[in-house]
Amino acid sequence: MLFRSAASYFNENYNRDIKIEEYASSRGMSVSWFIRNFKKFTGTTPMQFITSIRITNAQMLLETTNYAVNEIARIVGYDNPLYFSRLFHKQKGCSPSEYRKLLK
């Protein structure tokens, strides 16, 4: 239940500046314990989980809107569009702009 609650929180707040340390400590857990056990439950670290949610939502926005990549980065929770593009490329194998071109 604890990790389902965390996953739900991350899904609902993926576009905010989520600090794993603050999340864990506000629930009376050490950061290392939370990360280790979240990974056992989900198969991924909390930050990887959040990144995956953000990239999936960015992908949907690229498919369904004409928003600029910089705007999409901001919408899904990244202040730095370059960092967002690198993460997107790492997960999807192409840049956000290339992904959008492939859809046409």
Q: Where in this protein do the model-derived segments appear?
A:
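Short, contiguous hydrophobic alpha-helices characteristic of membrane insertion segments
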Residues: 87-90, 102
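Short hydrophobic/aromatic patch on the recognition helix
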Residues: 34, 38, 83-84, 88
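Charge-rich, low-complexity intrinsically disordered segments
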Residues: 23, 29-31, 35
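Core residues of bacterial helix-turn-helix
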Residues: 26-27, 76, 88
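Short linear Ser/Thr-Pro motifs
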Residues: 30-32, 65, 85
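Short, small-residue-biased leader/transition segments that mark boundaries at the very start
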Residues: 1-2
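Terminal helix-turn-helix DNA-binding modules in bacterial transcription factors
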Residues: 7-8, 12, 16-21, 40-82, ...
